[in-house]
Amino acid sequence: MKTKFLLLASLGLSTFLVSCKKEETVAQAQVVKEITVSLAAANENPQPAGRTESGSATIKVFSDNSITVDATLVGLSAADNLTLAHFHAGDPVTNGPVVLDLKPTFTGGTVKATLAAVRTSFIDSIKAGTAEIYLNIHSTQVGSGIVRGQLFNPVMFAASVALSGANEVPAVTTTATGTALLRITADNKLYSKVTVTNLEANDALTMSHIHTGAAGTNGAVLIGLCSSAADFGVTKINTPTPAVINSIKADGLYVNVHSTMKASGIVRGQIR
């Protein structure tokens, strides 16, 4: 009888211990969203001079509101070092504010970050997959960012075009200079931002276009970028035809900015 009692007690204790062990087991967080981001120096606004680094990042969002980021850069200069990485708010031609500091660790060209308890509003925007958010990785030599990439609707073509009066045909004498940022995204949208500074006080910007033509020649308008002075310095979005998209990606083209005093063009720059 005593032996039987001891056996039952032993079984009861084992059951109790197993039950406790099950209760102590914490469910592992599950991946609820995974994103692959293409990174490139060409996506920076503007592209850092002489830099061609590229890479990719894998972003995972978990059910417990944690996020991991694993990124690798290719071609990072041996004289440069990665320093910071953030998520920023902004479309492909905008440099926007930091919305989340990744606080990563760096090993050469690799970036690793794990963030716990990320705010729900940010997690929800990532899950929705429509927000204008980009990953920006900074370095010692390029503090503003050495590579970047949109989390959604990736950039498939990028050009940062320097504009000057010397590029006009014939050349124009002006204090004005500028930059045209051009980005074509995966949904075949053309994002552009044309900025001109130091324009003479007696002049005013009027319009800007992409024209066909190699350096030293004048050509026809391919597509408009700015139709009034108010369009300069702000993001413009066009939906070009497939033929225009292909031309922007491959042909000899230039950006031309027109003004009241220089109707044929005050500053210009070649896309290629």
Residue ranges and their predicted role:
Residues F16-S19:
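C-terminal motif of bacterial Sec signal peptides marking the signal peptidase cleavage site
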Residues L6-S14:
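Sec-dependent N-terminal signal peptides
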Residues M1-K4, K21-K22:
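Positively charged n-region of N-terminal signal peptides that target proteins for export
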Residues K21-A85, A89-S208, T212-R272:
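Metal-centered catalytic cores of metalloenzymes
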